[in-house]
Amino acid sequence: MTVAAPERAGGPWLYAGGPYPTAPAPVRPAAVLFDRDGTLVADVPYNGDPARVAPMPGARAALDALRGRGIPVGVVSNQSGVARGLLTRGQVEAVQRRVEELLGPFAVWAVCPHGPADGCGCRKPAPGLVLAACRRLGVAPEDTAVVGDIGADLGAARAAGARGVLVPTPVTRPEEIAAAPCRAADLPDAVRQLLGRPSSAEPVR
């Protein structure tokens, strides 16, 4: 995982992985971007401790199913703990490294370090993280899927023109679940749907 040059001052932090596979043009989605906390790993508020990183059930299998089909995977994550003075960039990056140790490499990380009052264009549900990740991967937002556990994740997908898939957890609000255009029981189910298989069909391998 290497730090990529910022697109502009005050924008998101970008981290480029790779080399990463590129899906053939007819394959949809061309890339899948995941929220981090509550989606790929258990949500530990403002976590700066790699030892507290715990993958969500089925996360590795779901990611490997996409990687095995040549579909790049990335992460789009709000980390307002930086703006609040609760996290350093070094802590954020240490947690990212631990996530990759447990779940494998990601083609791109797009991280918003700003707070809710900062007025940035990257904090979800704004589209900036999704758009920046798509540019880094060289894919069109409309050919990209975003998987997350709350309405802000799907809001960012919608604002960017991407497809959103909600994987609810106990903290997901009922109104967010009701409003989601696409829902999945868990990460393997989300991947099955994105690959065009029946929901809860054969196991993701």
Please report, for each region that a protein language model flagged, where it lies by residue.
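Active-site neighborhood of HAD-like aspartate-dependent phosphohydrolases
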Residues: V3-G74
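A short alpha-helix capping/helix-coil boundary motif
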Residues: L40-D43, V76-N78, V108-A110, L131-C134
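Asp-based, Mg2+/Mn2+-dependent phosphohydrolase catalytic module
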Residues: M1-A25, A30, G90-V108, A117-V146, ...
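Substrate-recognition element of Asp-dependent hydrolases with the DxDx(T/V) motif
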Residues: A59, L63-Q96, P105-D118, A157
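Short glycine-rich anion-binding loops that position phosphate/pyrophosphate groups of nucleotides
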Residues: T39, S80, G151
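Proline-centered helix-kink/hinge sites
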Residues: P50, P57, P113, P125-P127
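Short glycine- and Lys/Arg-enriched binding-loop motifs that mark or flank ligand-binding interfaces
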Residues: F34, V73, G81, T144, ...
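A short acidic, helix-capping loop that chelates divalent metal ions and anchors anionic groups
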Residues: V44, D49, G81-L86, G115-C120, ...
